[in-house]
């Protein structure tokens, strides 16, 4: 028997995109705290999700729980933060935050309406394992993870 395999291929383009709207900056209000709070000279990062197909994606956003680069830190860093809806392109999206779920530092939103949603991700890093030790001098970087997940 003579047989032939025939390839069938295709490309799927995501109907959900993630863009940085505002980069985050850590303020240093005291020796042992780094925070994105504007009152402490920080800047809260804002991420924008653009969705052209309703009920097809989740937005997953996680505030940082570790530095991706920093001076050597021999002691513990305690992390807190929050992810919230900042603005939407439609009032029909007003229930997004109330309907969201959390797991650790990650918050997930069902993107049920086509349009644009802006989220912020605040974070506070406290050094010293509860002893409020001074952060060593140097540059610190952490990452907010924001992704579209197909439902």
Protein language model features and the residues they cover:
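N-terminal small/polar-rich segments of proteins
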Residues: 1-78, 99-151
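Short, surface-exposed beta-strand/strand-loop-strand elements in extracellular ectodomains
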Residues: 76-88
